[in-house]
Amino acid sequence: MFRTVKQRLAVGATAAVLAATAGSFTASAADAAGTDLTYGSNILLQNQYGGNGGYLDTNGVSSQAGATYNVNTNQTPNSRGPATSVWKVVSATGKAAGTHVTSGDVIYLVNQYGSGTYLDTNGVSTKSGAKYMVSATSTKDRGPGTGKWHIFGKTSSPTDGRIRTDDIVHLLNDYGSANGGFLDTNGGANQSGAKYDVVTSHYTDRGAGTGSWKVLPSN
């Protein structure tokens, strides 16, 4: 069956609209996905309690044995000091810098303030619902597994196991054969300029979003 010129023009216009729509959908899907997180990257970790539980941050010299700095959250990243809210992701199993970080990996989180300190569990916490206190130390393995964290993504896009910026993650401490508890905010912090205290908890989310952390680029 032969089409008239008018029909051929209509078909061509429809095809163009469909192509443009498909292109727009593809671009939108790509834009929605975060950037793949790789080892050696510097990130911010935003707690999700109340939608914004503050950014994981070092704040002042710690009085805990073996610790260097206190750890809590801060309302505005790096507002208290240079790079106090910036954390470098380092493999605890020997994966090379530039390798993709995958859900279930074991990592070190190295704070970039000063000469760099490792996120660490240190001593039993007395706070209600908490397991261990959290601080930063100059030694990456102060105790067996105290400085290692299992990173678990809640989900991602695409669902290929990789961790990306804007993903929500849970961080399980490796102390006691991965029994050190999940990184958690718990009550107001005592340090000047801080928002919430940071401890570990038995639960992924002890409260609404207290154990959930959004991965964000540091710049």
What are these regions (language model features)?
Residues 30-219:
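Lectin-like carbohydrate-binding module/patch detector with strong preference for beta-trefoil
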